[in-house]
Amino acid sequence: MLYDNLAVNEQGHLTVGGLDTVALAEEFGAPLYVLDEDKLRENCRTYVQALRENMPEGSYPLFAGKALCFKGLYPVLNEEGMGADVVSPGEIYTALAGGFPAEKLYFHGNNKTDEDIAYAMDSHVGCFIVDNHQELARLDEAAGVRGIRQRVLLRVTPGIDPHTLQAINTGRIDCQFGVPIETGQAARFVADALSRKNLIVEGFHSHIGSQIFEAEPFCDAVDILLDFAQAMRQAHGFVAETLNLGGGFGVRYLESDPVVDIPGNIRALAEHLRQGCAEKDYPVPKVLLEPGRSIVANAGLTLYRVGGIKTIEGYRSYVTVNGGMTDNPRYALYKAPYTVVPASRMNDARDLSCTVAGRCCESGDLIQENIQLPEMQRDDLLAVLTTGAYNFTMASNYNRLCRPALVMVHHGRARLAVRRQTFADLVACDL
């Protein structure tokens, strides 16, 4: 099995967290998002412990809410010692509704509106990650009106290419996020920020990309950031207390993907940071990381019912399911790989070479192509593994399809965390 929280029971059914997925689909319906809370907590603890043991005091992980965001998630994150990265008022509202402390929220975004800024400040969000000069001016003004000094980190781009998908590569110079170091613009960005009397500049933020399997790209980013920090100390006497290195550690979607050693990578990163600071006689800053995918992806799976099975002679066979790009658009967007298994027939020989297609009126609505399954029958159950990240949050109502329910599994019990949408929900905002 791809992950240790998955198994096959005596009936030949896939289990997650010890629960039969066939029984889950019968109780809660399908399509169905399933999130293993025990696996989620284990992933949180891996990051919290690794940062606590290897980085300076005050270092901790911030969960990237863009990967998965619903109210019931945030109490778990808070209990496990996580902070949270939020990118919209909606994510802020969801986190606060889940009882998450506002001071542990870090607000991202390359185009925060005046309304966004006002809502975040009035909600007492702890820190803003500032993307550009215009935002600096607006934050300074908004903080002044409220009589506060707002904590900020400055997002800079180090010009790193971690060799990941172009769509998720965010560290290169030509990118809509942050201010580039190499062009000299980041130096002017820092000077501007330090001149703002209502802002407290705590340090720098960078994000180099996603699906990174080793520490080296992060170490390269640290080298560039430390050189930049040293230059800013010499120019302004400013010493960065915090380096936020963003997210990016990858997960296994296929058996062929490498295993990612999160503690080992963090340990290597910490050693590299300490060495770099020692060489420059620079105080070692606390480190924040922003894992999203690597916290929730392998804790989640999606269950589908098989509908039609169609073989086009001389070409291929299609197995259609009762979901698709509306609940997982990632294959349609960029051919994202997933492992698909016959959840109700795990022990059957997989002799059928096929493509799994969704139900949308769209030729690109595919889940995976050219995979092996048993000869499928209508109402068989399929499971797509490692869907905890960027499925629920990227879901849509295309073709006016209702979004699936989300169930959390914990200590051998399942509970409904997000109900399935109804037709009434689809027209609730229509006038």
Residue ranges of model-derived segments:
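Structural preference for beta-strand elements that scaffold enzyme active sites
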Residues: 60-62, 81-83, 102-106, 127, ...
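A charged N-terminal "starter" segment
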Residues: 1-151, 187, 191, 195-200, ...
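Charged (often Lys/Glu-rich) extended helix/loop segments that serve as interaction or gating elements
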Residues: 268, 274-277, 282-431
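Conserved residues at the C-terminal ends of beta-strands
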Residues: 108, 131, 207, 246, ...
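Short acidic, glycine/serine/threonine-rich loops at helix termini
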Residues: 73-74, 97, 117-122, 139-142, ...
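Active-site-proximal loop/turn and secondary-structure-junction residues that shape catalytic pockets
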Residues: 67-69, 90-91, 111-113, 132-134, ...
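Active-site loop/helix belt of alpha/beta enzymes
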Residues: 3, 159-308, 373, 401, ...
